[in-house]
Structure formats: structure tokens, C-alpha cells
Amino acid sequence: MNTARLNQGTPLLLNAVSKHYAENIVLNQLDLHIPAGQFVAVVGRSGGGKSTLLRLLAGLETPTAGDVLAGTTPLAEIQDDTRMMFQDARLLPWKSVIDNVGLGLKGQWRDAARQALAAVGLENRAGEWPAALSGGQKQRVALARALIHRPGLLLLDEPLGALDALTRLEMQDLIVSLWLKHGFTVLLVTHDVSEAVAMADRVLLIEEGKIGLDLTVDIPRPRRLGSVRLAELEAEVLQRVMQRGHSEQPIRRHG
């Protein structure tokens, strides 16, 4: 196991990270520490820098300035420990389900792929084609494809946004249960504030390239949907999202 990994999760440290596209400043000297194994949700208005942050962590973009670290190691040096899921499952239609899970792997990987499919409840669909699966099942395959690599960091970019309400709740429960079992670090970008407070240990609001709210969600698990405390936290985040202007220092709340 890489020395930057604590427990099974990757600890993250961002020091004064900025990302510019020409004159457009998307992230502006952002500082962030995420302990190993924490589940963090990131919310905010469109264009605020949420997905850019995930792309930096995934190695799909490089920062204009600042450091992105896994503990004391540059995250780019252990990028194989990071996996990312998108709203689109991105399955190859000409490959079977199990071959999509094992995509890019060499050697004896099929047993591990079957175990990953079993973990997401699709062990009986291994030989089928992606076209035979529902949207939720395709996302389960994408999750299995991430799990087979035993990631230290799982990045989720609106992976449930296109699913119906019931399937979305089922996927939320599945992701949380696998996180509790394996202990990897999770960053979830979502526009759904109720999803953020239901799933995460911590909710970050990114606005104007900085962290405008850093909210601890200390509600015991399993969490009961519709609970008063969840509703209160959701209202607090929504109120902050709707505020105009920008605070120089992040507002920290401990629920």
C-alpha cells in the first residue's frame, strides 16, 4: 500500500490552489484539508468551480498555482489510487458487463471483477451487454469498475443526476455502504443539497473559486430521510447558496 494512504483512504491537502482559463479565475487560492476516509460533498452554483476541483484531483487538469497533495506526496504521483465516476456511466457497448469492469486490467482479473459486481448486486449480469441494463444498473457497473482498483480516493461528479428518484436513493445507500466497508476518501459533487447532507460527513460550498461554507454533518448513521435535523442542515446550506456576495473567510458550522 502506498505510504500516502492512511487506513484505506487518501488524505488530501490543497495549498493555495488556483485554476485560471485565460482571464477567467475558476479556483482562487483555495485551501482545503480532507482527512483520510472522510466523505465530503461539494455543492454550489454552476460555474463556481466544483467540477474543476474534481478534475484537478483526478489529474485531468493541472493547477495554475498551488499544491495538490496526498498527505505529503504530490497527488499526481499516486494517481492510480484515484478513480472517478461521472453522470454518464461511460460503458463500452461492444464489451460485456464484466469486460467493462475489467477494462485495462491485465492478468487474472475476472475473479476480482466478479467480486466487484457482487458488491454492487450485479453478479448475475456479468455476461450481458450494457444495452440490456437500466440507467441505475449501468452506474452500478461503473461503480464496480472503480472498486476493482481498490481506490484510496473516489471522485463522484453528479453520478446520480440522471436517475429516477427511487433508483437514486438506492444508489446513495449503496455508495455509502461501500464507503463504510472499504474506508476510501470520497468527494461527491452534486447540485442536490438534500443528497449532500444525507450522504456526507462534511458539506463544502464553493463560490467564486473559494470555500464559502464548510459544514460538518455529525448525524449518526444510518440516517433517516425526512428527519428534522437533516432538513435543518439542508435549509442552512440552501440559504447560504442563495445569498449574494462573497465572504472572505469560509463559514464553518458543526451540526
UniProtKB/Swiss-Prot annotation:
PROSITE patterns: ABC_TRANSPORTER_1 (PS00211), ABC_TRANSPORTER_2 (PS50893), SSUB (PS51291). One of its GO terms (cellular component) is plasma membrane. GO terms for molecular function: ATP binding; ATP hydrolysis activity. It catalyses: ATP + H2O + aliphatic sulfonate-[sulfonate-binding protein]Side 1 = ADP + phosphate + aliphatic sulfonateSide 2 + [sulfonate-binding protein]Side 1. It is an enzyme of class 7 (translocase). Pfam families: ABC_tran (PF00005). Residues 12-233 form the ABC transporter domain. ATP binds at G44, R45, S46, G47, G48, G49, K50, S51. It is found in: Cell inner membrane. Gene3D superfamilies: P-loop containing nucleotide triphosphate hydrolases. The keyword Membrane applies. Its main location: membrane. CDD domains: ABC_NrtD_SsuB_transporters. It is a peripheral membrane protein. SMART domains: AAA (SM00382). Keywords: ATP-binding, Cell inner membrane, Cell membrane, Membrane, Nucleotide-binding, Translocase, Transport. Coiled coil: none annotated. Its EC number is 7.6.2.14. Belongs to the ABC transporter superfamily. Aliphatic sulfonates importer (TC 3.A.1.17.2) family. The complex is composed of two ATP-binding proteins (SsuB), two transmembrane proteins (SsuC) and a solute-binding protein (SsuA). Part of the ABC transporter complex SsuABC involved in aliphatic sulfonates import. Responsible for energy coupling to the transport system. This is Aliphatic sulfonates import ATP-binding protein SsuB. The gene is ssuB.
